[in-house]
C-alpha cells in the first residue's frame, strides 16, 4: 500500500514458465507476486512449445511450495476439457480455461456448440472430483448463481475507462483482444496525461457502441447484471459478422448451472459426494446470501 495515497497495489505476472528458477521464486515470494503460467496442457507444443521447460518450472515451484496458477487457451486441438483438466491439476490448484473466439486473424477458434458441450462435461466431472482445484470459468459461474460473485473479469465488468493495453513499443490499445485500427489510440509519448487518452474520438466511438449494446442487453437479457453487456472487443467483432462468443456461452451455460445447482441443493441431504471446493462455495453462500440459496434449494 502506498503510504502517501493509501492506494493498494497488487502485483502479478504471466509467464510461460520456461525460465523459472530458485532465484526467481525467491524474488516472487519477497515481492508477494501472484504468478500465472500460460500452458495449454496436453497440446502445449502445438502453439507454445518448450513444454519440457514449462513442466520443469512447475515442478520447481511445487518443490519450493510456491503455488502458481495456469491459463490455457482452448483451441480446436485441445477441446477435450476434461483431459486438459486432469493434466493441469498435476501442477496447479488454480486454473483457467480461455476459449479462442473468432477474430480477424485467428484460425484456431473453437465452435460455440462444441465448447459449450465440453464445458458441461467438464462441469459435471469437476463437481464429483475430490481435487480442490479452483477451476475457472466453472467456479466463476457457480459463484454468480449462488449470489456470492464479488469481483468480475474485464469482459464482464464494463472495463472502458478503467483499463488500457500498452505494448512494448508504446502502442496504446483499448483492448489487447483486437488489433483493428479502431482500437489503437496512438503512442504513449503522444499524450501529456492519461485523461487525454480517454477523451479522444476513437475511444468515445467505442464507448458509444457499448452504451447502445448495453441498453439493448439490459432490455432483453436476464443475465445483464452478470455480464454488463459483455466484452467491447467481441461486440466490435460481431459487427463484422462474427458471433458474440461470450454472450452465446452465457445464455446457454448459465441456465444449465442454475438447473443443476437447484437439483443438487433440493435433493441432496448431504454434499459429501461433491467437490470440496463446491461445498466450500455453498457454505460461503449460506453465510453471505442465504435467501439466494433458499431460492435454489429447499433449505
Regions found by a protein language model. Give the residues of each.
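C-terminal accessory region of radical SAM enzymes
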Residues: 115-147, 177-222, 228
